[in-house]
Design a protein with these regions (language model features):
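A helix-coil-helix interface module used to build multimeric assemblies
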Residues: 1-112, 118, 123-128, 137, ...
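Generic secretory/membrane-interface signal
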Residues: 21-24, 130, 164, 172
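Conserved short-loop catalytic and cofactor-binding motifs
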Residues: 80, 113, 141, 155, ...
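A conserved active-site cap/scaffold subdomain adjacent to cofactor or substrate pockets
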Residues: 146-217
Length: 217
């Protein structure tokens, strides 16, 4: 923030003295971070809506398609593939609600100056910023927005990543040669291996599994 202000000051001249008046770096950084998290969360909500739409459609399509149910990876009792997809659908419905709650939790701003006392800035400035950015004001004045808000937001991302991984691992298991109950989409000219052209590897599911672990970490 200091480097940014210095750069602006060199170009704006004497009026630059008002640019950061009464604020701290935390006012700028915490508020801008929360804006980014809110906007990112809305992108994820749209993605989850697409996932829900597809899972619902496919669950209905395959509601009478029999497959074997497994526990501990071992054949148990018959189920339908639609039931399996319906389970994924309900899980992502819960994830959507969690994400909505997380976005609401992180939608706050703080423009209250050093240690949050408004000593050198009018509280109306904070109200104006909150209204402009569609954020809420922190209920208790503070310099640093409490990190439990961020912890909740990122824990929800970890849960969503876990759900994505659960679907991906299921696809990987069902695509194994000795199982061969399910396959990722494989285009006509797609190659599975440079050395073994007969292979159809679940690359997308493998990538999703790896990315989910990175999110949780």
């Amino acid at each position: 923030v200091i480097a940014f202000l210095t750069s602006i000051t060199e170009k704006a001249g004497i009026k630059a003295r008002y640019l950061h008046q009464g604020m701290t770096s935390s006012d700028v950084l915490d508020t801008s971070l929360n804006i980014q998290l809110v906007q990112s969360g809305k992108i994820l909500l749209n993605d989850i809506d697409q996932i829900l739409k597809i899972l619902k459609r496919q669950a209905k399509k395959y509601k009478y398609t029999p497959c074997i149910g497994r526990s501990h990876g071992i054949h148990a009792e018959p189920i339908t593939f639609g039931l399996k997809l319906a389970s994924f659908y309900e899980e992502f419905k819960r994830n959507r609600k969690r994400l909505v709650d997380a976005i609401e939790e992180i939608s706050t701003c703080a423009i209250s100056g050093a240690v949050g006392t408004f000593a050198n800035i009018n509280p109306n400035v904070e109200k104006h910023v909150a209204k402009k950015l569609s954020l809420k004001i922190e209920p208790i004045s503070t310099q640093v927005i409490p990190r439990d808000r961020h912890a909740f937001y990122f824990s929800v991302l970890g849960i969503i990543a876990g759900s994505v991984e659960r679907v991906a691992i299921e696809i990987r298991h069902l695509q194994r040669t000795e199982v061969n109950e399910l396959q990722e989409y494989f285009s006509k000219d797609q190659k599975g291996s440079s050395a073994m052209p007969h292979k159809k590897n679940p690359i997308l599911s493998e990538n999703l599994t790896g990315l989910a672990r990175m999110v949780r970490s």
